[in-house]
């Protein structure tokens, strides 16, 4: 029995080289009549009568930034997706860490609603609670059960997927017809995959084991051997450019003259910022700079294989006659930094370089060479894809909004001006033996004992964007109740925290606005503009010359 059944109306071009045999065939999608009785997908608006619903492909990179030029190596991806469709210049994640962000993509929810707060089982990352409560309601599960889509997953799922305490590799999340998932975190060699619930180990032979290429090959085989009677959804989650930054052999000498960008916030002290940022050592040591330059270069090298993957997918879709009826999304789970505010390498922070991601989309009804400045977040991916499939967002409890009208060029569109960013810091209860001078409660202290995280690196922000304003307001849940506010129109590199130069009364209103977002759920998160109907926020008041005033203490609101 084959992993993927051969469609009866397509000639076979040789047996699948990369898909294993011996796995049980998935059940067929529900018949159309049953879907209609269940109130399923009724067809995407604007589709030709009698035409099949569109296919969707989502390619998800791991730790790929937008601010520091993360899309530069992906020339083919930009040409085949961005230039053939729409590029979003204001795409954000609600949490700058892998597992919470990926959970937001799958559920369409903010972290305070899906309750995945970090990359551990204790933090609800692929835990039994996640499996029981959230997985049945992910957008792929809805596509499968309510819309009759074939659903295919390949690559990194969640950081703790495959943990023995949460079902191991035998656990296949609800909603996936074909499951080809990596055990735990990103690797390029010497990893284990769950193939429809059965473990398969890979070694370190480039020709058969390099994970990005394996994902490309199994995805191409799916396109050749799937059923042609139903639409499909594919999610391909690459390891690149996540550490350990192992490039394919043919790309290991690329970008030899490339270094981490020396932008205005590179290797400077984080003045007037949260203590975790202030503890970074400025200037960085030469060894730290050399380390992050090498990391930056190697990250780009790994992305060249992702570029090849995208090219292969597009060409195969075109060869199979399916490209014109397929939406292709390209994005990342979070951004990254390399030396900004003297933090060597990581994500997790509230600044643009960590929370802003690439987002490119092509598909039916999207004009080529479009750029949108509309404020979108990865919680919008699920609602948008369900909208494409014809499933109403109001049937879900998702926090995000469908940006399909933006893709189709809708005019006079009422849209949000704010998204929420929230993060719960991680620390260690013991002192790091490599950094004995540091107290317990910190983590990710490398190199030179510069820490990237701590228990009280717990914060929530409102990111505000409109035609006139470009703002960020953040609160930390710590003893200081520290506040950071940035006017990104005047200060795009977030050098100047203006929290102490703003009227305390206005800060109080902004605090209340943040708490409204942190307590939202489902439809109340989708309300455009200001979330408190009794309050009209005027950003112009922020930049009046109030002088230096003492900021009031805010009421804390935990994630």
Curated annotation (Swiss-Prot):
<dbReference type="InterPro" id="IPR012251">
    <property type="entry name" value="GlcNAc_6-SO4ase"/>
</dbReference>
<feature type="binding site">
    <location>
        <position position="62"/>
    </location>
    <ligand>
        <name>Ca(2+)</name>
    </ligand>
</feature>
<keyword id="KW-0510">Mucopolysaccharidosis</keyword>
<dbReference type="InterPro" id="IPR024607">
    <property type="entry name" value="Sulfatase_CS"/>
</dbReference>
<feature type="glycosylation site" description="N-linked (GlcNAc...) asparagine">
    <location>
        <position position="190"/>
    </location>
</feature>
<feature type="active site" description="Nucleophile">
    <location>
        <position position="98"/>
    </location>
</feature>
<feature type="glycosylation site" description="N-linked (GlcNAc...) asparagine">
    <location>
        <position position="429"/>
    </location>
</feature>
<feature type="glycosylation site" description="N-linked (GlcNAc...) asparagine">
    <location>
        <position position="456"/>
    </location>
</feature>
<feature type="glycosylation site" description="N-linked (GlcNAc...) asparagine">
    <location>
        <position position="369"/>
    </location>
</feature>
<feature type="glycosylation site" description="N-linked (GlcNAc...) asparagine">
    <location>
        <position position="205"/>
    </location>
</feature>
<feature type="glycosylation site" description="N-linked (GlcNAc...) asparagine">
    <location>
        <position position="412"/>
    </location>
</feature>
<comment type="similarity">
    <text>Belongs to the sulfatase family.</text>
</comment>
<comment type="function">
    <text>Hydrolyzes 6-sulfate groups in N-acetyl-d-glucosaminide units of heparin sulfate and keratan sulfate.</text>
</comment>
<dbReference type="GO" id="GO:0030203">
    <property type="term" value="P:glycosaminoglycan metabolic process"/>
</dbReference>
<dbReference type="GO" id="GO:0008449">
    <property type="term" value="F:N-acetylglucosamine-6-sulfatase activity"/>
</dbReference>
<dbReference type="GO" id="GO:0046872">
    <property type="term" value="F:metal ion binding"/>
</dbReference>
<feature type="glycosylation site" description="N-linked (GlcNAc...) asparagine">
    <location>
        <position position="286"/>
    </location>
</feature>
<feature type="glycosylation site" description="N-linked (GlcNAc...) asparagine">
    <location>
        <position position="124"/>
    </location>
</feature>
<dbReference type="Pfam" id="PF00884">
    <property type="entry name" value="Sulfatase"/>
</dbReference>
<keyword id="KW-0597">Phosphoprotein</keyword>
<feature type="binding site">
    <location>
        <position position="334"/>
    </location>
    <ligand>
        <name>Ca(2+)</name>
    </ligand>
</feature>
<feature type="modified residue" description="Phosphoserine">
    <location>
        <position position="548"/>
    </location>
</feature>
<feature type="binding site" description="via 3-oxoalanine">
    <location>
        <position position="98"/>
    </location>
    <ligand>
        <name>Ca(2+)</name>
    </ligand>
</feature>
<feature type="glycosylation site" description="N-linked (GlcNAc...) asparagine">
    <location>
        <position position="217"/>
    </location>
</feature>
<keyword id="KW-0378">Hydrolase</keyword>
<protein>
    <recommendedName>
        <fullName>N-acetylglucosamine-6-sulfatase</fullName>
        <ecNumber>3.1.6.14</ecNumber>
    </recommendedName>
</protein>
<feature type="binding site">
    <location>
        <position position="333"/>
    </location>
    <ligand>
        <name>Ca(2+)</name>
    </ligand>
</feature>
<dbReference type="GO" id="GO:0005764">
    <property type="term" value="C:lysosome"/>
</dbReference>
<dbReference type="InterPro" id="IPR000917">
    <property type="entry name" value="Sulfatase_N"/>
</dbReference>
<feature type="region of interest" description="Disordered">
    <location>
        <begin position="1"/>
        <end position="26"/>
    </location>
</feature>
<keyword id="KW-0458">Lysosome</keyword>
<feature type="signal peptide">
    <location>
        <begin position="1"/>
        <end position="47"/>
    </location>
</feature>
<feature type="glycosylation site" description="N-linked (GlcNAc...) asparagine">
    <location>
        <position position="118"/>
    </location>
</feature>
<feature type="glycosylation site" description="N-linked (GlcNAc...) asparagine">
    <location>
        <position position="394"/>
    </location>
</feature>
<feature type="binding site">
    <location>
        <position position="63"/>
    </location>
    <ligand>
        <name>Ca(2+)</name>
    </ligand>
</feature>
<dbReference type="GO" id="GO:0005539">
    <property type="term" value="F:glycosaminoglycan binding"/>
</dbReference>
<feature type="glycosylation site" description="N-linked (GlcNAc...) asparagine">
    <location>
        <position position="324"/>
    </location>
</feature>
<dbReference type="InterPro" id="IPR017850">
    <property type="entry name" value="Alkaline_phosphatase_core_sf"/>
</dbReference>
<keyword id="KW-0325">Glycoprotein</keyword>
<feature type="modified residue" description="3-oxoalanine (Cys)">
    <location>
        <position position="98"/>
    </location>
</feature>
<keyword id="KW-0732">Signal</keyword>
<feature type="glycosylation site" description="N-linked (GlcNAc...) asparagine">
    <location>
        <position position="487"/>
    </location>
</feature>
